[in-house]
Structures are given as structure tokens and as C-alpha cells.
Amino acid sequence: MTTIRVLGSAAGGGFPQWNCNCRNCDGVRRGTVRATPRTQSSIAVCGDGPEAILVNASPDILQQLRQTPALQPARAARDTAIAAVLLMDAQIDHVTGLLMLREHRRALPLYATASVLEDLAGAFPLTRILSHYCGLQCHALPCDGMAFSVPPLDGVALTAVPLQSKAPPYSPRRHAPQPGDNIGLRIEDRHSGRSAFYAPGLGQVDDHVFAQLRRADVVLVDGTFWRDDEMQALGFSTRSAADMGHLALSGPGGMIEVLDRLPARRKILIHINNTNPVLAEDSPERAELARHGIELAYDGMEIAL
């Protein structure tokens, strides 16, 4: 059976964010807001054996590993269940955890699109840096709809789905995006046939992506912001959610409306920004999610396919 373990469910900065005193962050620190702290988003895809694919390497990876005993099977003096790392994009909050894995005993298998590998070899040269430590064994992901497997998890079929989103701010392609800067991931159990679609950074839902969402038994998608102008209204940024490559949850054409059109048995939001009112468990926004049958991912959540 294929299981998805949510290691981290917050957007970049985590929740509470280290330098933020918005209502959510200040309230969770003081105990005046009923909410659960969350680390920065990452999942582990696990098969029948102990090995797992780490999908995105969060800056919080060490804390996440400590909180997930299954990823430390202790079969040898030095051991890990992480068989490989797969990246959805080259965003800072999805790749810097690779630096924390530098003690890996041999070259760490890394799966990413050609454009992500290009950013990690140039603008943010993690591959060069890690060549002085464990090293990376890089594999370019196909973006043509072909399914692939990551050894030794041969019972899990993966498909990279290019998304309309943005390359990281540091990328020379930030304002000239290309397919592969950001992907969604179809995760299918080859035995049961059940599948999930994972997309923590989803700026637009075109017909191709919607078709992937409709096929999935479980969708685990971008829940970063409640409103498109959320950061602007709080005075934290001049950019909208759309400017940052995220589809807001509320409003016409928002993620809630998209999810309402899907037959999936589970609809789950991940990559939740610290400002999002859904984090407060007794908020009207959280209640609205419940009315629509939408769940909020949390660190430690397990999803069986």
C-alpha cells in the first residue's frame, strides 16, 4: 500500500513565522488563537517497505525527521529511509533542506525537471556545494506525461505534470517561465490503482491540470492564501497571491470553487501561509472549508492510497 506522510504543511517561513506578529502568529505563541504550529511543506511517499521518497526538502527537514520515526529505520550505524528526493520546483523553502542531508553516505538521488536542475546548478548552486559532501545523483524528470518509478518504490507510479506558475525570485527565468519550473505530481499505487495529485504551488488551473485533478482519488493542493489580496491588506507585501504564483482559496474561480467540482474522496489543502485565517480552528473560514468537505493538512497526517 502506498502512504503519503505529511512532514510539513505550512508555506515558506512555517507557522508561526519567526519574525511575524500577525494575528495568527502572535496568537498561537500567546495561546490566544486555537491553532496548530506547522513546519514548511514537504511530504514523504512510502511503499510497502521502509524506503520513502522525500518530495521537497524543507529547511525544517531535521525537525520533520525527528518527528517521523518511520524515516529512521535504524538498520545500521548510519541509516535513513530516504531513498531519493524529488523536487516540485526550485523554491528556497523546497530545496534548502538538501544541505541538511549532506551527511548521506553516498550520492543522494535527486529527481527534478531540467529547468529546476539548471537553477540548482547556476543561480542557486546547491549541486556544486553538495559535490563537496555527499554529492547528488541527478535525474531529469520527464514532463511529457510519461509515468516513472523511483527505485526501490517500484509499486508507485509517478507522473510529473507541468503547472502554470513562476520560477523562484532568484531564477533568471522568473519573468520568463517555462514548462517544468513548477510541477504537480500524480502518485498512483500500481496495485490498488488509487491515486493522489499533489500540487503545493498552484497558480492557475487550466484544462490539463483540471483533468489530472478529476482523475485523482485524493487531491493535496495549494492552500496558501485565503484572499488574493491577503498580504497587501495586512501591509506585508505589494504583491497579490496570483503575483506570487498561488490561487487564492476564496472568491470567484478560487480553489474552493475548483475543489467543489471534483469527485475526489478527499480534498486536502497544504502549503498554508501563516497569515491564512483557516489556521485558526474556530474561524469562520475554517468552518467554510468544513462545509465544502475540504480538509487542512497538518504535520504528521497520513494518507493511504
From Swiss-Prot:
SUPFAM superfamilies assigned to the protein according to its UniProt record, in alphabetical order: Metallo-hydrolase/oxidoreductase (SSF56281)
Keywords, alphabetical: PQQ biosynthesis, Transport
tRNA processing as UniProt keyword: no
Record has Transport as a keyword: yes
One family name in Pfam for this protein: Lactamase_B_2
Any one GO BP annotation for this protein: pyrroloquinoline quinone biosynthetic process
Lineage: superkingdom: Bacteria
Family matches, as Gene3D superfamilies: Ribonuclease Z/Hydroxyacylglutathione hydrolase-like
Pathways involved: Cofactor biosynthesis; pyrroloquinoline quinone biosynthesis
Cross-referenced InterPro entries: Metallo-B-lactamas (IPR001279), PQQ_synth_PqqB (IPR011842), RibonucZ/Hydroxyglut_hydro (IPR036866)
Family: Belongs to the PqqB family.
Role this protein plays: May be involved in the transport of PQQ or its precursor to the periplasm.
Identification of the protein by name: Coenzyme PQQ synthesis protein B
High-level lineage: Bacteria, Pseudomonadati, Pseudomonadota, Betaproteobacteria, Burkholderiales
Gene from which this protein is expressed: pqqB
